[in-house]
Amino acid sequence: MEKSMASSNLIKQLQERGLVAQVTDEEALAQRLAQGPIALYCGFDPTADSLHLGHLVPLLCLKRFQMAGHKPVALVGGATGLIGDPSFKATERKLNTEDTVQEWVDKIRRQVAPFLDFDCGENSAIAANNYDWFGNMNVLTFLRDIGKHFSVNQMINKEAVKQRLNRDDVGISFTEFSYNLLQGYDFACLNKLHGVALQIGGSDQWGNITSGIDLTRRLHQNQVFGLTVPLITKSDGTKFGKTEGGAVWLDPKKTSPYKFYQFWINTADADVYRFLKFFTFMSIDEINALEEEDKNSGKAPRAQYVLAEQVTRLVHGEEGLAAAKRITESLFNGNLNALSEADFEQLAQNGVPMIEMEKGADLMQALVDSELQPSRGQARKTIASNAITINGEKQSDPEYTFSDSDRLFGRYTLLRRGKKNYCLVCWK
């Protein structure tokens, strides 16, 4: 597809995928995109040491724009991360130290980098940090040059902070209230520095984005645009991107590639085709064909595997995907020979329940400690009934004690009760 053709239809394509929540002056933006490549930006605040799944949709949107010939700017909020965005947050955020925020900025910048192309000629991506323009700004400049253009009357009517202003118990500090000015100035600054004409972000960012559009017009007399992506919801009403263990992170040290892959495999049928539109680069036709195929196959749908494979490859590369599939396969068929030491480390990290034990423990004790069995008596019966495997091998002797050959890589023993209940023993 030709780039210009892709560009003018880009908003329509994003809408077809369900990726547009709100857009300012859609007609003018479509015209602007039709005229040729633009620069656009999305901001990522360092509120933790890793991005999570909620960041993936706007990040992939930057990539979609770049693939259509536009220039993406990934802004990491070294300054805004020190202040904290109050948008739709019920309580004040905890302020983090400058050292912590700086460390997180570096991590997040490294995390964003693989998604974009920083060396492709005209539309190479740019990495920016708003600490560069706020770090040395003095308070008088801030109040005179930025504050003067903001009406408090309008600010207190923004949906994002309304709930905080109407509550006596939590309220909102001046620090967080001023966040809107900082993000607004980011847009004006990037417009001047890089000619940025569009900001994209999550739908909770609408108030901050429109402030930036307004400020850019007042400071530079330029028309710029905003587009928000929807908050991802699940058909059952539960929160997307959370598991019982908390958020699903993009950092493999926080959420292992295996756990990440399993998260997508467990997507409900009611959500999977929508998620393929949000999180992959498959065409709408390919997704519809897959849905049709799944409907008529009479077998379990293939869509979850396609989704898990595509997103895991995007985030963790071929190597991470291969490990996730290898571990999945080994747990399914009970043959652990293919697993590497690093694979066991992933399982210990957050793949299956894990306990640490001293050498010399017997099988009954391990089953009780791992909560695979409630008591030694019950464990004895279960072992005798042939329902327990050690590293994939059945073990029916209740008096069994572990030997060195049970400790894979000198450290790991995988217990299974029945078909699906696992525990990994890590020997001290």
UniProtKB/Swiss-Prot annotation:
Motif 'KMSKS' region boundaries: 239-243
Record's catalysed reaction(s): tRNA(Tyr) + L-tyrosine + ATP = L-tyrosyl-tRNA(Tyr) + AMP + diphosphate + H(+)
Listed CDD domains: S4, TyrRS_core
Keyword annotations: Aminoacyl-tRNA synthetase, ATP-binding, Cytoplasm, Ligase, Nucleotide-binding, Protein biosynthesis, RNA-binding
Enzyme class, first EC level, given as a word: ligase
Residues the record lists as binding L-tyrosine: Y41, Y179, Q183
Domain S4 RNA-binding: 361-418
GO MF annotations in UniProt: ATP binding; RNA binding; tyrosine-tRNA ligase activity
A GO BP annotation: tyrosyl-tRNA aminoacylation
Localization annotation: Cytoplasm
EC number: 6.1.1.1
Motif interval(s): 'HIGH' region: 46-55
Protein's UniProt keywords contain Ribosomal protein: no
Coarse class of the protein's main subcellular location: cytoplasm
Pfam families: SYY_C-terminal (PF22421), tRNA-synt_1b (PF00579)
A cellular-component GO term for this protein: cytosol
Binding site for ATP: K242
UniProt similarity note: Belongs to the class-I aminoacyl-tRNA synthetase family. TyrS type 1 subfamily.
SUBUNIT field: Homodimer.
Known function: Catalyzes the attachment of tyrosine to tRNA(Tyr) in a two-step reaction: tyrosine is first activated by ATP to form Tyr-AMP and then transferred to the acceptor end of tRNA(Tyr).
Name this protein carries in UniProt: Tyrosine--tRNA ligase
Species annotation: Cronobacter sakazakii (strain ATCC BAA-894)
Classification lineage: Bacteria, Pseudomonadati, Pseudomonadota, Gammaproteobacteria, Enterobacterales
